[in-house]
């Protein structure tokens, strides 16, 4: 029987086993395979495959290259954990260099990446092999803030632009219609600070503070209703915290939950429920350490099943860390005080990591 005559489900299963880096070659082989590889059910098979393997996927940006990176945690016989990191595919290389990732703010949502350049936006979908350049509406501002999400009713991706002196003027770009629009809703707050947002279930959440409030909070933009939600409480007291004291990081978990890491106490909370206007939290992990670890630029992810968190960080033992674009340390923290520091330059099965944008999901 020829491959073209095989049942659709069987072809999906076969193609889902093809490594990501070979998919483009597969698509060019047969029109039916090309159409099938862009089918949502085929994408879901890849999502399920990654979930079963327990592998975490990231987009890694170095000076000249962009890679797909797979990160795996392995439990050893003595209940310790080992970290292995694998380069899965090269997305952009020196040979076909495009400077869209250089000096860019890179935002991720559901497998799509938004690269924010001066007076230029670039949307990249590595899975489909698509790139789209978008001109923002004037006036341009160096403090303009962007977010990427999608309409849950239509599935269409949208770009949110916050601009103006207080970053409370809004524009929305709809990728399905290739057009900018001014939404009915506004941000009725003069924002003092908004950390780069995290996409979760099509919406974007920021760690934020406005000029009138004393406390920091979570702020959500709902891309389906095209409006901001009410400020959501964080799971800890904000008293005495500044931008750098009590530094916090956000991370999405399987497009279902949001995790927040408070660096100075090394406590991780995970949402039990999260919506644009409601949130509840529970402690996932607390690490009692003296002295505490100072982390400033780290990415982190958690493995709920193994009850482990992995934090990627720059080595701050010398002043060179301020100018080093790479993550060269990893901290693995778990239950019962488990803690392990990994030097990514010296450990087997690891490598020095460039800028990690996000955990990837199709």
Swiss-Prot record:
Residues 1-50 form the F-box domain. NCBIfam families: F_box_assoc_1. Kelch repeats lie at residues 150-201, 293-341. The keyword Membrane does not apply. Gene3D superfamilies: 1.20.1280.50. Keywords: Kelch repeat, Repeat. This is Putative F-box/kelch-repeat protein At3g20710. PROSITE patterns: FBOX.
């Amino acid at each position: 029987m020829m491959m073209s005559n095989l049942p659709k489900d069987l072809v999906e299963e076969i193609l889902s086993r093809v490594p990501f880096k070979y998919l483009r070659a597969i698509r060019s082989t047969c029109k039916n395979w090309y159409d099938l590889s862009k089918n949502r059910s085929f994408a879901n098979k890849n999502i399920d495959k990654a979930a079963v393997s327990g592998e975490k996927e990231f987009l890694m940006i170095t000076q000249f290259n962009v890679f797909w990176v797979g990160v795996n945690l392995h439990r050893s016989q003595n209940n310790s954990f080992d970290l292995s990191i694998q380069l899965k595919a090269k997305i952009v290389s020196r040979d076909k260099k495009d400077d869209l990732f250089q000096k860019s703010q890179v935002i991720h949502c559901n497998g799509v990446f938004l690269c924010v350049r001066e007076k230029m936006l670039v949307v990249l979908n590595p899975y489909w092999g698509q790139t789209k350049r978008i001109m923002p509406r004037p006036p341009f501002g160096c403090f303009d803030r962007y977010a990427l999400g999608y309409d849950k009713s239509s599935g269409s991706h949208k770009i949110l632009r916050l601009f103006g002196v207080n970053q409370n003027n809004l524009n929305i770009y709809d990728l399905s219609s290739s057009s900018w629009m001014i939404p009915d809703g506004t941000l009725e707050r003069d924002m003092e600070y908004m950390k780069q947002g995290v996409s979760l279930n099509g919406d974007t959440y920021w760690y934020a503070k406005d000029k009138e409030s004393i406390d920091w909070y979570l702020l959500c933009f709902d891309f389906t209703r095209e409006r901001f939600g009410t400020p959501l409480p964080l799971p800890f007291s904000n008293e005495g915290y500044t931008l750098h004291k009590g530094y916090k990081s956000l991370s999405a978990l399987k497009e279902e939950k949001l995790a927040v890491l408070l660096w100075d106490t090394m406590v991780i909370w995970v949402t039990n429920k999260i919506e644009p206007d409601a949130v509840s939290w529970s402690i996932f992990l607390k690490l009692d350490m003296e002295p505490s670890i100072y982390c400033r630029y780290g990415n982190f992810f958690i493995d709920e099943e193994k009850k482990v968190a992995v934090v990627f960080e720059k080595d701050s033992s010398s002043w060179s860390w301020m100018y080093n674009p790479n993550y060269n340390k990893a901290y693995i923290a778990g239950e019962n005080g488990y803690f392990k520091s990994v030097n990514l330059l010296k450990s087997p099965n690891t490598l020095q990591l460039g800028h990690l944008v996000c955990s990837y999901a199709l």
